[in-house]
Amino acid sequence: MRNFKREYRLIAGLTGTMGFEVGAVDATTGRSLRIVFNVERGDSESNNTASINIYNLSPQSLAVLAQDNCVIDLQAGYDGDMATIIQGIVSHIETNRDGADTCTEIDIVDGLVATRDTNVSVSYKGSINGKKIISDAAANMGCSILFSPSCTFPAFKNFSFVGSATKLFHQVCGASNTNYSIQNGVIQVCAANEAITAMAYVLSAETGLIGFPERLYDNASSSNSGNANTTKRKTQKGWKVSFLMNGHIQANDYVALESSLASGTFRVSKIDTKGDSEGTGEDSWTCTAELLEVS
């Protein structure tokens, strides 16, 4: 992987329509529009989010962003190697002056319309597998759905449900010892502590690892029956790592970590991506991830 020459593309518009794209270098100025972004993604049921500041957008581009349910696809990386960091719906937009420039602040939410607007009313007679229930719910949400290799679901008898699709997912996945999240508009359902695929991305100094991994701990409680006081003990659960921008690594992926402090295969539980196309220093175009031990 060559971590050279930062590149990004921001593509915006309503689904199925022509919108706009920025990020390519202007042939006259030799520069692209400046972008600053912070993307937070994880394996929880909460929607992934991003805040994006982009400078000197045209009035036509601003009009596209102002449309209801405008979709943004943010791609970033290096010369010849970009990947989607996040795809989501604009939830807030505001443009202000910043000296001689204009700065447009954009908030986006992954899967906003699907989770906000979809209610389901279902009733299945007899025995129905949980996978069928949530697959039908995903179709109602307009989302594709993926399952990790070891996902299994129990059968539900005479299952009925009325309410939000997200509550249905929570109920069925909770009863199946699986977890769901939305990643770039796709629902991912994973068995406990399992990645969505078996493929692992190598993360080492040669592929962009910055510095050394930092231990992550869970606080676990232990108590003595003869004493009401509760003590805390630290149990290691994984590693926190920083690395140069790599949009190929997403939440629910496996990472093969290669470092003198830690090595092995881990699952990405959370990943924060920060970028400034005109920033200086390697820390202005990076990812920070929490990698959990795979049991």
Predicted regions and their residues:
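Glycine-rich, acidic and aromatic/proline-enriched surface loops and short helix-turn segments
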Residues: 130-144
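Assembly/oligomerization scaffold segments
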Residues: 1-106, 238, 295
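Second-shell loop/turn segments in exported
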Residues: 118-127, 155-159
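Short beta-strand-centered interaction patches in the first periplasmic/extracellular domains
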Residues: 97, 101-113, 140-220
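Short solvent-exposed strand/turn elements
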Residues: 101-117, 280-295
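Extracytoplasmic/secreted envelope proteins and their assembly/folding machinery
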Residues: 87, 131-135, 166-170, 236-238, ...
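An acidic/polar, Gly/Ser/Thr-rich interaction patch typically located in mid-to-C-terminal regions
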Residues: 37-61, 65, 193-295
